[in-house]
Amino acid sequence: MGKYFGTDGVRGEANLELTPELAFKLGRFGGYVLSQHETEAPKVFVGRDTRISGEMLESALVAGLLSVGIHVYKLGVLATPAVAYLVETEGASAGVMISASHNPALDNGIKFFGGDGFKLDDEKEAEIEALLDAEEDTLPRPSAEGLGILVDYPEGLRKYEGYLVSTGTPLDGMKVALDTANGAASTSARQIFADLGAQLTVIGETPDGLNINLNVGSTHPEALQEVVKESGSAIGLAFDGDSDRLIAVDENGDIVDGDKIMYIIGKYLSKKGQLAQNTIVTTVMSNLGFHKALNREGINKAVTAVGDRYVVEEMRKSGYNLGGEQSGHVILMDYNTTGDGQLSAVQLTKIMKETGKSLSELAAEVTIYPQKLVNIRVENVMKEKAMEVPAIKAIIEKMEEEMAGNGRILVRPSGTEPLLRVMAEAPTTEEVDYYVDTITDVVRAEIGID
C-alpha cells in the first residue's frame, strides 16, 4: 500500500481526509497517468454511490479530468462493477468509482480502473502518488478545444442491467427478496430481477445520502432475514453500498455467506466442466468448513491474502475463472473483471432454477465452523506492526498450541480502516469465544485506542 492508495483505492472521511482538493488532484493526475499513451482524445467513465458527499467529490474529480483534456462520461449512481464492465466493453481509457463500499456514510473513496477493466496495479498507483507528492504541478494545461468534454451517460446503467439479465435464466415468478443497502444497487437490482421474472420484495431502496449501509445491506442482513421469512421468499439477496458484494439468505432465514456462495457456484461450474483448472481462488479468511467441502468434492483451491485485488491477481496470473472472499466478493472472470454482487445473485438464482434445489439444500454441503471476528481500533501505524509486539505474538502462539491443529487463528490489519482484526475458528462457539477474547484482551492492553 502507498501513502494515498490502500487495498481498494483512496479512502477517508469525506471533506476532512478525502477532500475536494484531493479529488481534483486525483482526477487530474490519475487521468493523466492512465491516458498519456492514448492516440485519440481519451474517454473516462465516472460513477458513484448514494453518499451525500458523492456529488461534491464527483464535481471535483471531473474538473481534474477535464483539465487535462479527458472527455468524461458521467454514469450517475450505479454499482462499482458496472463501471468496470462499461470501461472494458466500450473502449474507455479508464473508469473511476466514487464509493467507500461497505463503510458508513461519512466515509468515501475513489478507485480507478484501467482500460482493461481491472483495478490499477501498484506501479500505476505509485505513478499517481509521485505526482501528488511533487512540489509543483507541471502537467499540461490545455485551453479552449484542448479541454475535455462532459457527457451525461445514463444509458450506461441500462446496458449493464441488460448484460446481467442476459447471463441469467427466467425465474418464472420465484419469490426473491432484495436488500440494496440504500446504495448503488438501488438503481438497478429491482429492474434486473423484474426482467428475469421474479416476484419481488425490496428493502434498503430509499437512499437519502446518509443511510447507506445503515442497518441494511450485506454487513447488516438481519432485516432481510426477517423479510425473507415474512414474505415466503425462496431467497434473499443483500448487497453492500457499491454492490460489489453479495450475502444471501435461504428460505429459512439463514445466512449464506461468500464461502457458501463460492462453493455453490464452483460445484455447478465444475460439474459442467467450466471451472478453470477445477480451482477456486479464496483468501486466508475462508472457513475451514469451506476447505473441507472443496476437498470432498475434489475441487482445488488457491489461497491468497485478504482483499479482492489479491484474489484477482492470482486469477489473472494462473488463468482461474472463479474466486472470492467470505465477505461476499465473488469474482466470475468469465463475466466481469471484479467482484459483482448483482452478477453473483443472478448466477445463484440460475443455479437454483436449473438444479431444482432450494438454497438451503445447496448450502448444506458446507458445514461452517464457528468463527468469531473482532475489530480493534488502533493507530494506523501500529496495525502493521502488531505482530512485532512480544506480548501479542506470545499469546497467539499459546492459543495455537492449545488448538492442537483443530482450529485456526488469524490476526491481520484492515486494508482500509485503522483496525486490527482478530479471528478464530474452532469446533464450538465456547472455544472460539475463549481464543478470541483472550487475544483481544492482550491486543487492547498493548496497542488499543478504544
Swiss-Prot record:
It is an enzyme of class 5 (isomerase). Keywords: Isomerase, Magnesium, Metal-binding, Phosphoprotein. It catalyses: alpha-D-glucosamine 1-phosphate = D-glucosamine 6-phosphate. The active site is at 101 (phosphoserine intermediate). Its EC number is 5.4.2.10. Activated by phosphorylation. The modification Phosphoserine is found at residue 101. One of its GO terms (molecular function) is phosphoglucosamine mutase activity. It holds the Pfam family PGM_PMM_I. Its cofactor is Mg(2+). InterPro entries: A-D-PHexomutase_a/b/a-I (IPR005844), A-D-PHexomutase_a/b/a-I/II/III (IPR016055), A-D-PHexomutase_a/b/a-II (IPR005845), A-D-PHexomutase_a/b/a-III (IPR005846), A-D-PHexomutase_C (IPR005843), A-D-PHexomutase_C_sf (IPR036900), A-D-PHexomutase_CS (IPR016066), Alpha-D-phosphohexomutase_SF (IPR005841). Binds 1 Mg(2+) ion per subunit. Transmembrane segments: none annotated. Mg(2+) binds at residues 101, 240, 242, 244. Catalyzes the conversion of glucosamine-6-phosphate to glucosamine-1-phosphate. This is Phosphoglucosamine mutase. It comes from Streptococcus pneumoniae serotype 2 (strain D39 / NCTC 7466). The gene is glmM.
